[in-house]
Amino acid sequence: LTAFLFVASIPAGQATFVDTVEAAYLGAALETQDDRMPPDRMQGVVSIRDSIRLAGWRNNKVFLSEVFQPHNWPAKYDMTLDHNIVSMGEQDFKLYVTTDGSPYIIDVSSCDDTKCTPVVSIDTPLPNIGCRYANASVMTRHGFIYASTMGLVLLTGTGAWHIITKKWFGE
């Protein structure tokens, strides 16, 4: 494993530097070597309350920033879903992800150095028909609501879903 260690501060106008610093006098290792900038062309960003972490998406990929480092989006947190993402909301450290197929609920409180678990996939096709419009879905105290081909869908933190307009509108 290679690490970049601090050797010296060099003035901006200095063209050369000869490294004669002994290993015992080297500074700390660079802690940002594995940092990654936010992925290009993210289509949306959601703030995860109380953890100072961000979540975003592009096509069918979910991206998470490091906790307390909104500038750092490590690849180790990247997740690929089966369908393209339309919208995302957050409540109680759960990401509600609607797609052009089935919705997902991602528990981001359990993210460690390798992955976030569990990712709950709702097996019923409930595509979001919000046409990628940011205000076509809403987070409420009861869960995440969005428009699907079956009516307004309410997703709860347990993974349960309900068509809340079913009694007023038939199929």
Task: Please describe what each predicted stretch is.
Residues 2-3, 26-30, 69-73, 111-121, ...:
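Beta-strand initiation motifs
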Residues 5-10, 21, 57-58, 66, ...:
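Glycine-rich, histidine-containing beta strand-loop boundary motifs that form or position
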